[in-house]
Swiss-Prot record:
Heterooctamer of four alpha and four beta subunits. One of its GO terms (biological process) is alanine biosynthetic process. HAMAP family: PanD. Its cofactor is pyruvate. It holds the Pfam family Asp_decarbox. Binds 1 pyruvoyl group covalently per subunit. The modification Pyruvic acid (Ser) is found at residue 25. It is an enzyme of class 4 (lyase). NCBIfam families: panD (TIGR00223). Belongs to the PanD family. This is Aspartate 1-decarboxylase. GO terms for molecular function: aspartate 1-decarboxylase activity. It comes from the Bacteria. It comes from Staphylococcus haemolyticus (strain JCSC1435).
């Protein structure tokens, strides 16, 4: 059996920019991407904590150390600058792979700096 599991998560990032006229996607600081094993062009699910919107797009790597979280194209209509978002990727695993799977979760502060990294096999508790 194949199961779809959360693989990488950026928890409580703040939207720094919104660009309607860009060709689509979300731009994320490359350092943040590396921390949670998200690749450029990878599909991400996004939840806006401020308005409840849920949507999908793909990733563009942003400047390292910038803290940039920029929604581009049509997705920019679903956020405002300073909204708090959760960005997630998923992976499909078989029963054997599930044994060793540990998602990477980066908990962010208001400046989009990583304040906690969580690597847990059994759910995550944010402290």
């Amino acid at each position: 059996m194949i199961r779809t599991m959360m693989n990488g998560k950026i928890h409580r990032a703040r939207v720094t920019e919104s660009n309607l006229n860009y060709v689509g996607s979300i731009t994320i600081d490359a350092d943040i991407l590396d921390a949670v094993d998200i690749l450029p062009n990878e599909k991400v699910a996004i939840v806006n904590n401020n308005n409840g919107a849920r949507f999908e797009t793909y990733v563009i790597a942003g400047e390292r150390g910038s803290g940039k979280i920029c929604l581009n194209g049509a997705a920019s209509r679903l956020v405002e600058v300073d909204d708090v978002v959760i960005i997630m990727t998923y992976v499909q695993l078989d029963e054997r792979e599930l044994v060793d799977h540990a998602p990477k979760v980066a908990v962010m502060n208001e400046k989009n700096e990583i304040i906690q990294m969580i690597h847990e096999k059994e759910g995550t508790i944010i402290k």
